[in-house]
């Protein structure tokens, strides 16, 4: 999707997105990511506008590999905490304030419906829980990304992911899974321990990463 939106921007053409996974907000946002050929993170880029329309079929999402919904939940959980952390203390214009307000609605719904959505993915069923979570992952976080500049959109959690792509680690780890661990780091750094513990318990129940070994970092030299 990121390649297509960049190609459309270069060609000056409108584009539409048809996500088959609920793994991140790429279908709705005008933000893309570049990687080097060795898969290490390079930079983000912004196109002039996001897709003209995003078509989401929850039956397709329900039948996609479960791990992408799982990682998408991990990615979306970061949005509220990263945006609120980055915007704290700033006087914001209307659009950015709207983004921060919307971000504040993201995590509770994911924590409330995430496990049911994953069970629906196991059963290949397009339940209300799966629809809610998929829209949160793709739409809510994408709209926020369109309202906020880069330095508000991501902070500690995504910085940890970006660094993770450049260090030796065991196994392959999806973007959202690593970002989810980074969110635990952010909440710890920011002293939001009650919120951190709530998220940690959710990660334990859903097997999202909640330790360095869960994202393949076990070598003391790499740490």
Predicted regions and their residues:
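A glycine/threonine-rich phosphate-anchoring loop and its flanking beta-alpha core
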Residues: 10-102
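Active-site segments that bind and position negatively charged phosphate/pyrophosphate groups
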Residues: 93-201
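Short glycine/serine/threonine-rich phosphate/pyrophosphate-binding segments
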Residues: 1-6, 25-28, 153
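C-terminal charged capping/lid subdomain of soluble metabolic enzymes
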Residues: 192-223
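N-terminal small/polar loop signature for handling phosphorylated ligands or for N-terminal nucleophile
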Residues: 1-15, 116-129
């Amino acid at each position: 999707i990121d390649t297509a939106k960049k190609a459309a921007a270069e060609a000056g053409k409108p584009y539409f997105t048809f996500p088959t996974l609920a793994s991140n907000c790429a279908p709705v946002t005008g933000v893309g990511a570049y990687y080097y050929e060795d898969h290490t993170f390079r930079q983000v880029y912004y196109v002039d506008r996001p897709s003209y329309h995003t078509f989401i079929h929850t039956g397709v999402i329900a039948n996609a590999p479960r791990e992408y919904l799982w990682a998408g939940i991990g990615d979306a959980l970061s949005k509220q905490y990263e945006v609120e952390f980055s915007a704290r203390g700033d006087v914001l214009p209307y659009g950015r304030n709207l983004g921060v307000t919307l971000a504040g609605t993201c995590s509770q719904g994911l924590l409330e419906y995430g496990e049911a959505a994953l069970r629906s993915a196991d059963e290949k069923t397009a339940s209300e829980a799966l629809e809610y979570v998929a829209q949160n992952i793709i739409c809510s976080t994408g709209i926020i990304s369109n309202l906020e500049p880069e330095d508000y959109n991501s902070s500690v959690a995504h910085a940890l992911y970006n660094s993770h792509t450049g260090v030796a680690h065991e196994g392959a780890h999806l973007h959202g899974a690593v970002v989810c661990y980074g969110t635990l780091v952010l909440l710890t750094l920011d002293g939001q321990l009650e919120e951190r513990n709530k998220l940690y318990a959710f990660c334990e129940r859903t097997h999202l990463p909640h330790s360095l070994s869960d994202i393949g970092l076990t070598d003391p030299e790499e740490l």
